[in-house]
Swiss-Prot record:
The keyword Endoplasmic reticulum does not apply. It is a multi-pass membrane protein. Gene3D superfamilies: ABC transporter type 1, transmembrane domain, P-loop containing nucleotide triphosphate hydrolases. Catalyzes the transport of the major hydrophobic bile salts, such as taurine and glycine-conjugated cholic acid across the canalicular membrane of hepatocytes in an ATP-dependent manner, therefore participates in hepatic bile acid homeostasis and consequently to lipid homeostasis through regulation of biliary lipid secretion in a bile salts dependent manner. Transports taurine-conjugated bile salts more rapidly than glycine-conjugated bile salts. This is Bile salt export pump. Liver. It catalyses: cholate(in) + ATP + H2O = cholate(out) + ADP + phosphate + H(+); taurocholate(in) + ATP + H2O = taurocholate(out) + ADP + phosphate + H(+); glycocholate(in) + ATP + H2O = glycocholate(out) + ADP + phosphate + H(+); glycochenodeoxycholate(in) + ATP + H2O = glycochenodeoxycholate(out) + ADP + phosphate + H(+). GO terms for biological process: bile acid and bile salt transport; bile acid metabolic process; canalicular bile acid transport; cholesterol homeostasis; fatty acid metabolic process; phospholipid homeostasis; positive regulation of bile acid secretion; protein ubiquitination. It comes from Canis lupus familiaris (Dog). The gene is Abcb11e. The keyword Glycosyltransferase does not apply.
C-alpha cells in the first residue's frame, strides 16, 4: 500500500482539478497527529507561551500588577535599612549606659569623662553622651515602619488583584478555545484519546495553568525583587561579609529548588497512579450490576488497591524528600548564622570596618535574598506544573483537525439528489492501523431507493455509514455524493443532509421535545409532534405524566430501548434529511411499531436516499436494493428475490434466520425495560473506532446488564434555551447533598491508629521544630546584646558561644525536620490508602438500589473517593505535625516573651489575632487561586462529558456549536465570581503582608518607652518582639489550615456514614442459608415491587410463576411489563416489597447473597466487559477460584469465540478496550456467553443473549446455549420465537403479572395474548 494512489480533496475553493496524492503521505498525515499527541508530553511549552491568550487589557493589568509587585519587593530590603540603623541607635544608647555605670565616669557637657577627687576633669575619653533621646528615635522608626506598612498594603492588593483578574480573563479564553478545538476534532482523534483524559484536561489541567499565571506570578516577581535587592544591599553595605555569607547561600537556593522540582515530579507520579485507581473505580462502579452478578467485589477491591500502593509509595517519597531538604535548608540557615556572626563580629570588633547595625543589615539582607530565592522555587513548581499541563492543552489547540467539522471550506450543493458511490474504498481505523476494515469497496446507492446492507459481524457495514457521514476519510479511494468527492463538500452542510438512527441511540439529558429538536434547530412543536407520530413514539410520549417535557435521564436512562429508538427516529425524521442512515434502527421495536415506522419511511422515500443496516428479514425485504458485504467488500447486489436465486451471502443469512421461525412476522416479541435495541453485527472488529466507542459513558449510569428504570438524572444546559438547567432544577425534585455532622477527630485519629509509632516520632520532631523559631529569636537578640558590652574579650567569648549554639540548633533541625516530614508523610499516605480502600470496598458492598440514587452516580462516587480521602488528611497526617509545631512554637515563644518583659508582651499580644489571621490569609493565598465557582464548573464539566462521551451522535446531528454555546454560558458565572474574589484576595494578601510592619511599629515605639523609663535592656525588646511576631505568623500558618481541618471532618463524616451504612442486602456477610445440593428450583410467589428511585411506579404487581430444576422458563411481553425486573429480584439486586422469591424452597431474603449469585450465570443484551484481556474477561465468570486456561478455551469454544480470538495478534491476551470498545457487538456478546459458561451455574439467565449476533453467529451460539442449558434451570427473555418456542414454560406478562403461561403449543391453542403476539405482532395490553 506504500505507493497506492488515492483521490483526495477534489473540489476546494479556487480549484476544480482532481488532485492525486500518495496514500503514504495521507496516512502519515493522519497518524502524525496521533503521534504528535504522544510526543507533546515530552516537550513542554515555553513559559511565556502560557500568556498566549492575553489581550492588551490583560497585558496592562499584568504590567501594573508586576510594577506593584516590584515595589512590594523593595519594601523588605527597605525595612532592613531601618532595622540596621535602629540596631545601631539601641547599641549606642546601651553602650552609653554601660560606660556611665563604671565608677568615676560621668556625663559632662555631652561628653563622658573621668571625675577625680579634686573635681578636675580628665577629658581624654571624649565619648559623647546625653545627645540620644531613645524615645523620640523610636517614634521616628515607628513612623517609618507604618509608612512601609501602608505601601505594602496598597501594592500587595494591586499586585494580586490585577494578576488574578488578568489570569481569569485568559483562563476563560483558554477554556473556551480548547473546548471549541476539541469539538472540531475528527472522530479518529477521539478513538485515540480517552474521554476521561479530555475531561481532566478541561478541569485539572486548566486549573493548573491558572495556578501558574494567577497569584504565583506577582509573588514570584516580589520575591525575586526582594532577593536581588537583598543581595545588592549586602554588597553595598559590606562586600567582604557578603561574599562569605553568599558562598553558603546558593546551597539554600539549590535546596529550595530541589524541593520544588522533586515535589512536582513525585506529585505527578502520584496523581497518575491515583488517576489509574480512579479509572478502575469508575469502570467498576459504572458496571456495578455485572460486578455484583459475578461476585467480583473482592477482586475489584484488590485491583483498586494495587494502584493505590503505587500512589502511596510516591507520596511517601515526596514526604522524605521534603523532610530532608527542609531540614537541610534549616541547617544551612543556622550554619550561615554562625558563620556570619563569627566573621562579622571579627570585622566589627577587631577591624572596626562595620557597625553592629551594618553587620545585621548585611546578614539579614543576604539571608532575605537567599530565602526569597528559595521560596520563589515554590512558584517555579507552579510554573513547571502549569507548563506541563499547558503542553497537552496547547498541543490540542494547535493541532489541525484532519476533518474539521466546523470548517467553512467546501462546496454546498444547490441541489442534492442523494446518489452515493464508493470508489475502490480501503479503510482502517486510526487506532488499529494494522486491521483493514474495508477492502477495495465499490458500490452505488441510488437516490429515491431504500438500500439494505447485510453481512456477517465485522464485514464493514456500519463503517461504510461512518464514511458517508465523513467521520473518517478512506485510506484509499473516495466516497462521492452526486459525483462530488465528499471531502470537497462543506462538512457541516453535508451532515445536515443526513439523518442517522443507531442501534444504541444516544439521547441527551434533557426533555423528549428538546431531544427531537436536536434534529432541526428551528423545528416547531407541530414538527416535533409530526415526527413523533411518524416514528410511532407519540402514543407512549402522551402516556407520560409530563409528555414531551419529560426528562429522559442521562443517556436516556429513564426510557426503555424501544422508546429511545423511537425518539431517535423522530429526531432523524424531523430534519427531513435527503439521506437517511439506519443502523439497526428498528431492532428494539415490536412488529407493529416497526411496520408503522417502515410505512413512514416509505412515504418519505421519494427523492430521499435510505441506507439500512439490518438483519431482520422484514426490514431487509422492504428494501429496493440489498447489498451483501463480506470481509469489507460488497460481494453481491440485487433485490430479495434476485439474491435468493444467486444463493450467496444473503441466501445463507436468510436461510439461517428462517429456520425455526414459524411465521414470517413472528419476531416482534420485544423486551420491556431493556436498554438499547438488538445489537447486531457492528463491523469494526477489534478497533477502538467501533461505532459504539463514543457511546460508553452516556450508558455508564446504568450497567448494560441492568434492564430496569433508573433514577432521574439532572438535565444539562445543552439545549437552545440556556436557562433550561436552572428552570429544571427549580421545577424538578432533584435531591441535594444532605447536611452532615462533622466527624469527631477522635474517630479520625482512631482510623489512623495503626500508624501511631510514626505519628509519635513525627510529633516529637514537630515539637522540636516548633521550638527552633523562638530559640532563634533568643540567640539573635543575645548576639545583638553583646555588642554593647564594654569588655571586648567578653564580647568575643559570648559571640563564639552563641555561634556554636546556632550550629547545634542547625544539626538538630536537620534530623527533626526529616523525622517530621517522613513520619507524617508515611502515616498520612497510609491513612489515605486505607480510607480509599475501605470506602471503595464499602461502596461495592451496597445494594444496587443505593446506586440508583442520584447522589451515588459513578461520577459522584469516584470523586468522593478521590477528594474526600485526600481531604481527611486535613485532620491527620502532616496537619498533626503542623499543629504540634505551632503549639510548641507559641508556648516556647510566650514563655520567653513573658519572662523577659510581660508588659511589652501584652502590647504585642494585642496584634496577635491580626498576626495569626494574616498568616492564615497569606498561606491560603500562596496555595493558589484555583477555587473557582465549583457548582458552575461542575455543570460545565457535565456538558463537556456529555458532549465528548457521545461525540459521534453530536457530530452526526451537527450540534457541536450548541454544546460549545452551552459550555461557554456556564463559564460566565465563575468568571464573574473571579473578579469579586480577586478584590477580596488582593486585600487579604496586602493586609497579611502589612500587619507585621504595623505590629513592629507599635512594639518598637512602646519598647522605646520602656528602655529609658523602666530600664528594659534593648536586647530584650528584640527578643520579645521577634519571639511573639514569629510565633504569631507561625500560628497563622497553622490556622490557615482551619478550612482544611473543617473539610477533613466533613469528608471523614461522609466516609464513616458510608462505612456505617448497613445495606438491606449484605454482600460481604457470611450469614444466610447455604446448602450443598443446589437444584435450581425457582418460585416467584405473589411478588410486588417498585424501584427505590421510582416508588410511585409499580413494576411487579403480584408476579407468580414457578420453574423446576432443569426447565426453561421464557418471559414474553411488551415493554415495561416487568420481565427483566424479575431477573433482578432473582439475582437479589433488589428484594420484593411484598411476596417472596423462593430458591429450592428457601426464601431468597434468607439465602447467603454470595452463595446465591455464585449459582447463577447471566448473559445480557448489552454485556459489560472490563478494560483487560479477553482471557481475564472470561475468567471474571468465576471469581471464587483460579480458572485454568483449558477451561477458558473450552468455554470460548462453546461460545463460538475461540477461532476469532486465535485470529488476533495477541490472542487471549488481547485487551478489549474500555467497555469492550475494541470489539464488535457480536464479539462482545460471545465473550459474555463464555464468561457465563465458565461459571458452570445451576441457574442460567439469558436476557436477549443472542440479539447482538448476526444470523450466522446466532445459530452457532444458540446451539452452544442449548447445550449450556442442559441440566440447568434457565430463564430466558427474548423476542425471537426460535429462541423461546422450545421452552418448557412460556410466561406472558402484562403490567407486572403473568396473564398466560404454558408451552408454545398450549398457548397457541388458547388463542389469547400469546397467539395474538405471534400471529400479528401486536403488543400485549
Amino acid at each position: 500500500m506504500s505507493d497506492a494512489v488515492i483521490l483526495r480533496s477534489v473540489k476546494k475553493f479556487g480549484e476544480d482539478n482532481y488532485g492525486f496524492e500518495s496514500s503514504t503521505f495521507y496516512n502519515n498525515d493522519k497518524n502524525s497527529g496521533l503521534q504528535d499527541e504522544r510526543k507533546g508530553d515530552s516537550s513542554q511549552v515555553g513559559f511565556f507561551q502560557l500568556f498566549r491568550f492575553s489581550s492588551t487589557t490583560d497585558i496592562w493589568l499584568m504590567f501594573v500588577g508586576s510594577l506593584c509587585a516590584f515595589l512590594h519587593g523593595l519594601s523588605h530590603p527597605g525595612v532592613l535599612l531601618i532595622f540596621g540603623t535602629m540596631t545601631d541607635v539601641f547599641i549606642a544608647y546601651d553602650t552609653e549606659l554601660q560606660e556611665l555605670k563604671i565608677p568615676g565616669k560621668a556625663c559632662v557637657n555631652n561628653t563622658i569623662v573621668w571625675i577625680n577627687s579634686s573635681l578636675n576633669q580628665n577629658v581624654t575619653n571624649g565619648t559623647q553622651c546625653g545627645l540620644l533621646d531613645i524615645e523620640s528615635e523610636m517614634i521616628k522608626f515607628a513612623s517609618y515602619y507604618a509608612g512601609i506598612a501602608l505601601l505594602v498594603l496598597i501594592t500587595g492588593y494591586i499586585q494580586i488583584c490585577f494578576w488574578v483578574i488578568a489570569a481569569a480573563r485568559q483562563i476563560q479564553k483558554m477554556r473556551k478555545i480548547s473546548f471549541r478545538k476539541v469539538m472540531r476534532m475528527e472522530i479518529g482523534w477521539f478513538d485515540c484519546n480517552s474521554v476521561g483524559e479530555l475531561n481532566t484536561r478541561f478541569s485539572d489541567d486548566i486549573n493548573r495553568v491558572n495556578d501558574a499565571i494567577a497569584d504565583q506570578m506577582p509573588i514570584f516577581i516580589q520575591r525575586m525583587t526582594t532577593s536581588i535587592c537583598g543581595f545588592l544591599l549586602g554588597f553595598y553595605q559590606g562586600w567582604k561579609l557578603t561574599l562569605v555569607i553568599i558562598s553558603v547561600s546558593p546551597l539554600i537556593g539549590i535546596g529550595a529548588a530541589i524541593i520544588g522540582l522533586s515535589v512536582s515530579k513525585f506529585t505527578d507520579y502520584e496523581l497518575k497512579a491515583y488517576a489509574k485507581a480512579g479509572s478502575v473505580a469508575d469502570e467498576v462502579i459504572s458496571s456495578m450490576r455485572t460486578v455484583a452478578a459475578f461476585g467480583g467485589e473482592k477482586k475489584e477491591v484488590e485491583r483498586y488497591e494495587k494502584n493505590l500502593v503505587f500512589a502511596q509509595r510516591w507520596g511517601i517519597r515526596k514526604g522524605i524528600v521534603m523532610g530532608f531538604f527542609t531540614g537541610f535548608m534549616w541547617c544551612l540557615i543556622f550554619l550561615c548564622y554562625a558563620l556570619a556572626f563569627w566573621y562579622g563580629s571579627k570585622l566589627v570588633l577587631e577591624d572596626g570596618e562595620y557597625t553592629a547595625g551594618t553587620l545585621v543589615q548585611i546578614f539579614l539582607s543576604i539571608l532575605l535574598g537567599a530565602l526569597n530565592l528559595g521560596n520563589a522555587s515554590s512558584c517555579l513548581e507552579a510554573f513547571a506544573t502549569g507548563r506541563a499541563a499547558a503542553t497537552s492543552i496547547f498541543h490540542t489547540i494547535d493541532r489541525k483537525p484532519i476533518i474539521d467539522c466546523m470548517s467553512e471550506d467546501g462546496y454546498k450543493l444547490d441541489r442534492i439528489k442523494g446518489e452515493i458511490e464508493f470508489h475502490n474504498v480501503t479503510f482502517h481505523y486510526p487506532s488499529r492501523p494494522e486491521v483493514k476494515i474495508l477492502n477495495n469497496l465499490s458500490m452505488v446507492i441510488k437516490s429515491g431507493e431504500m438500500t439494505a446492507v447485510v453481512g456477517s459481524s465485522g464485514s464493514g457495514k456500519s463503517t461504510a455509514l461512518q464514511l458517508i457521514q465523513r467521520f473518517y476519510d478512506p485510506s484509499e479511494g473516495m466516497v462521492t455524493l452526486d459525483g462530488h468527492d465528499i471531502r470537497s463538500l462543506n462538512i457541516q452542510w453535508l451532515r445536515t443532509q443526513i439523518g442517522i438512527v443507531e442501534q444504541e441511540p444516544v439521547l441527551f439529558s434533557t426533555t423528549i421535545a428538546e431531544n427531537i429538536r436536536y434534529g432541526r434547530e428551528d423545528a416547531t412543536m407541530e414538527d416535533i409532534v409530526r415526527a413523533a407520530k411518524a416514528a410511532n413514539a407519540y402514543n407512549f410520549i402522551m402516556d407520560l405524566p409530563e409528555q414531551f417535557d419529560t426528562l429522559v435521564g442521562e443517556g436516556g436512562g429513564q426510557m426503555s430501548g424501544g422508546q429511545k429508538q423511537r425518539v431517535a427516529i423522530a429526531r432523524a425524521l424531523v430534519r427531513n434529511p435527503k439521506i437517511l442512515l439506519l443502523d439497526m434502527a428498528t431492532s428494539a421495536l415490536d412488529n407493529e411499531s416497526e411496520a408503522m415506522v417502515q410505512e413512514a419511511l416509505s412515504k418519505i422515500q421519494q427523492g430521499h436516499t435510505i441506507i439500512s443496516v439490518a438483519h431482520r428479514l422484514s426490514t431487509v425485504r422492504a428494501a429496493d436494493v440489498i447489498i451483501g458485504f463480506e470481509h469489507g467488500t460488497a460481494v453481491e447486489r440485487g433485490s430479495h428475490e434476485e439474491l435468493l436465486e444467486r444463493k450467496g451471502v444473503y441466501f445463507t443469512l436468510v436461510t439461517l434466520q428462517s429456520q425455526g421461525e414459524p411465521t414470517a412476522n413472528a419476531e416482534g416479541i420485544r423486551g420491556e425495560e431493556e436498554t438499547d435495541g438488538v445489537s447486531l453485527d457492528n463491523e469494526q472488529t477489534f478497533c477502538r473506532g467501533s461505532y459504539q466507542s463514543s457511546l460508553r459513558a452516556s450508558l455508564r449510569q446504568r450497567s448494560k446488564s441492568q434492564l430496569s428504570y433508573l433514577a432521574h438524572e439532572p438535565p444539562l444546559a445543552v439545549v437552545d434555551h440556556k436557562s433550561t438547567y436552572e428552570e429544571d432544577r427549580k421545577d424538578k425534585d432533584i435531591p441535594v447533598e444532605e447536611e452532615i455532622e462533622p466527624a469527631p477527630v477522635r474517630r479520625i485519629l482512631k482510623f489512623n491508629a495503626p500508624e501511631w509509632p510514626y505519628m509519635l516520632f513525627g510529633a516529637v520532631g514537630a515539637a522540636v521544630n516548633g521550638s527552633v523559631t523562638p530559640l532563634y529569636a533568643f540567640l539573635f537578640s543575645q548576639i545583638l546584646g553583646t555588642f554593647s558590652l564594654p569588655d571586648k574579650e567578653e564580647q568575643r567569648s559570648q559571640i563564639n558561644g552563641v555561634c556554636l549554639l546556632f550550629v547545634a540548633v542547625g544539626c538538630v533541625s536537620l534530623c527533626t525536620q526529616f523525622l517530621q516530614g517522613y513520619a507524617f508523610a508515611k502515616s498520612g499516605e497510609l491513612l489515605t490508602k486505607r480510607l480509599r480502600k475501605y470506602g471503595f470496598r464499602a461502596m461495592l458492598g451496597q445494594d444496587i438500589g443505593w446506586f440508583d440514587d442520584l447522589r451515588n452516580s459513578p461520577g459522584a462516587l469516584t470523586t468522593r473517593l478521590a477528594t474526600d480521602a485526600s481531604q481527611v488528611q486535613g485532620a491527620a497526617g502532616s496537619q498533626i505535625g503542623m499543629m504540634v509545631n505551632s503549639f510548641t512554637n507559641v508556648t516556647v515563644a510566650m514563655i520567653i516573651a513573658f519572662f523577659f518583659s510581660w508588659k511589652l508582651s501584652l502590647v504585642i499580644m494585642c496584634f496577635f489575632p491580626f498576626l495569626a489571621l494574616s498568616g492564615a490569609l497569606q498561606t491560603r493565598m500562596l496555595t493558589g487561586f484555583a477555587t473557582q465557582d465549583k457548582e458552575a464548573l461542575e455543570i460545565a464539566g457535565q456538558i463537556t462529558n456529555e458532549a465528548l462521551s457521545n461525540i459521534r451522535t453530536v457530530a452526526g446531528i451537527g450540534k457541536e456549536r450548541q454544546f460549545i454555546e452551552a459550555f461557554e454560558a456556564e463559564l460566565e458565572k465563575p468568571f464573574k465570581t473571579a473578579f469579586r474574589k480577586a478584590n477580596v484576595y488582593g486585600f487579604c494578601f496586602g493586609f497579611s503582608q502589612c500587619i507585621v510592619f504595623v505590629a513592629n511599629s507599635a512594639s518598637y515605639r512602646y519598647g522605646g518607652y520602656l528602655i529609658p523609663n523602666e530600664g528594659l535592656h534593648f536586647s530584650y525588646v528584640f527578643r520579645v518582639i521577634s519571639s511573639v511576631v514569629l510565633s504569631a505568623t507561625a500560628l497563622g500558618r497553622a490556622s490557615s489550615y482551619t478550612p482544611s481541618y473543617a473539610k477533613a471532618k466533613i469528608s471523614a463524616a461522609r466516609f464513616f456514614q458510608l462505612l456505617d451504612r448497613q445495606p438491606p442486602i449484605k454482600v460481604y456477610s457470611s450469614a444466610g442459608e447455604k446448602w450443598d445440593n443446589f437444584q435450581g428450583q425457582v418460585d416467584f410467589v405473589d411478588c410486588k415491587f417498585t424501584y427505590p428511585s421510582r416508588p410511585d411506579t409499580q413494576v411487579l404487581n403480584g408476579l407468580s410463576v414457578s420453574v423446576r430444576p432443569g426447565q426453561t422458563l421464557a418471559f414474553v411481553g411488551s415493554s415495561g411489563c416487568g420481565k427483566s425486573t424479575s431477573i433482578q429480584l432473582l439475582e437479589r439486586f433488589y428484594d420484593p416489597d411484598q411476596g417472596k422469591v423462593m430458591i429450592d424452597g428457601h426464601d431468597s431474603r434468607k439465602v447467603n447473597v454470595q452463595f446465591l449469585r455464585s449459582n447463577i450465570g447471566i448473559v445480557s443484551q448489552e454485556p459489560v466487559l472490563f478494560a483487560c484481556s479477553i482471557m481475564d474477561n472470561i475468567k471474571y465468570g468465576d471469581n471464587t477460584r483460579e480458572i485454568p486456561m483449558e477451561k477458558v478455551i473450552e468455554a470460548a469454544k462453546q461460545a463460538q469465540l475461540h477461532d476469532f480470538v486465535m485470529s488476533l495478534p495477541e490472542k487471549y491476551e488481547t485487551n478489549v478496550g474500555s467497555q469492550g470498545s475494541q470489539l464488535s457487538r457480536g464479539e462482545k456478546q460471545r465473550i459474555a456467553i463464555a464468561r457465563a459458561i465458565v461459571r458452570n451455574p445451576k441457574i442460567l439467565l439469558l436476557d436477549e443473549a443472542t440479539s447482538a449476533l448476526d444470523t450466522e453467529s446466532e445459530k452457532t451460539v444458540q446451539v452452544a446455549l442449548d447445550k449450556a442449558r442442559e441440566g440447568r434451570t434457565c430463564i430466558v427473555i427474548a423476542h425471537r420465537l426460535s429462541t423461546i418456542q422450545n421452552s418448557d414454560i412460556i410466561a406472558v406478562m402484562s403490567q407486572g403479572i403473568v396473564i398466560e403461561k404454558g408451552t408454545h403449543e398450549e398457548l397457541m391453542a388458547q388463542k389469547g395474548a400469546y397467539y395474538k403476539l405471534v400471529t400479528t405482532g401486536a403488543p400485549i395490553s
